[in-house]
Amino acid sequence: MKKKSSDFCLCNERKSQLSKFLENLSIDFSNFDLLNTALCHSSYSNELDQKSSNNERLEFLGDSVLNLIITDHLYKTYPNKSEGELSKARSYIVSEDSLSNIAREINLGSYILLGRGEESNDGRNKKGILADAIEAFVGAIYLDSGFSRATEFVVGLFDMYIRLMFNRGDFKDYKSLLQEYVQKKYKISPSYKLDKEIGPDHDKVFCVELYVGENFISNGKGKSKKEAEMRAAEVALKAMENINL
């Protein structure tokens, strides 16, 4: 049965869902209709015969805003890096793999409106849909709150990944690579468990364990939980082919 056009309206239940999403990210948003559009995939709007009421235009805008923010941040934060290094870093950061991983970190997929076909085909976990949605979300933040607020949001999400890249000397997103490998081979997702925290609050080290199903695979340490998870994923990915689960 075809959806009614009224299904696209921002009902109280949907607004409550979006409010929870924003609360988790500590973001204020004025225009909830704009936010709702940013999280509406074309498969959903097509079922309503409202083909323009989806996130494609916001994705177009957000792509440019995101690139400018990342370029500006890299240029100002890493004055000793060459143009080639900065270009390589930017390409990695705004890649589909990196954007989809960031989207998973903030649970963005749970709030995307999808058509029945994409819903049944696990669209919430598709890298392309997630990457497009986070670009549209950045575009919506820019329109709603301005460039400064969009910059604060983007840098807050990506800064840890950028620092890890330069510290390691490579540009691989091990969490995304591991996620893809495990899902393809075992049809499940890896999980991360905080094992312990070491040291005082001003110099804390987080220790994380990585599991595939019930099987312990690796651990990692870092100055943040995300950094520890990335390091655990790096160890796991390099060892995975030698592990018989």
Swiss-Prot record:
It catalyses: Endonucleolytic cleavage to 5'-phosphomonoester. Its cofactor is Mg(2+). GO terms for cellular component: cytoplasm. SMART domains: DSRM (SM00358), RIBOc (SM00535). InterPro entries: dsRBD_dom (IPR014720), RNase_III (IPR011907), RNase_III_dom (IPR000999), RNase_III_sf (IPR036389). It is found in: Cytoplasm. The active site is at 63, 135. Residues 173-242 form the DRBM domain. Gene3D superfamilies: 3.30.160.20, Ribonuclease III domain (1.10.1520.10). The keyword Signal does not apply. Residues 18-146 form the RNase III domain. GO terms for molecular function: double-stranded RNA binding; metal ion binding; ribonuclease III activity; rRNA binding. Its EC number is 3.1.26.3. Mg(2+) binds at residues 59, 132, 135. Keywords: Cytoplasm, Endonuclease, Hydrolase, Magnesium, Metal-binding, mRNA processing, Nuclease, RNA-binding, rRNA processing, rRNA-binding, tRNA processing. It holds the Pfam family dsrm. GO terms for biological process: mRNA processing; regulation of gene expression; rRNA processing; tRNA processing. Belongs to the ribonuclease III family. PANTHER family: RIBONUCLEASE 3, RIBONUCLEASE III. Homodimer. Digests double-stranded RNA. Involved in the processing of primary rRNA transcript to yield the immediate precursors to the large and small rRNAs (23S and 16S). Processes some mRNAs, and tRNAs when they are encoded in the rRNA operon. Processes pre-crRNA and tracrRNA of type II CRISPR loci if present in the organism. This is Ribonuclease 3. It comes from Borreliella burgdorferi (strain ATCC 35210 / DSM 4680 / CIP 102532 / B31).
